[in-house]
């Protein structure tokens, strides 16, 4: 090896050693039914928004919802956990990012039901039915955290 190549090799080593892995977003664990297509689309929505998503297919979501504190009547087709919060249903990634940034004293967020046009429930016409993202307080209270659809 000549001097020039040796020098280039020595200069390259620190650069290679400094290379960083791409930044990864917050880890979200999604519990869903294996057969649910809209859940898969919501998972894709989160991944495209920069979240690291782990999916666990469940045969019974009831115990998961109960464990994390999803109130009766406020459920949907999948339950996620991120940063000490639950995320129930088709909550937009931007609202989850806001939750993690603001860190309110709460159990989590929910979009009850499956509103047309919410992430994972998009329709060909582009229609978005009005829906609310609800914040579930530690005491079980609910308040509107975000509103989507007409009149946003």
Regions found by a protein language model. Name each.
Residues 43-82:
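N-terminal, post-signal-peptide region of Sec/Tat-exported proteins
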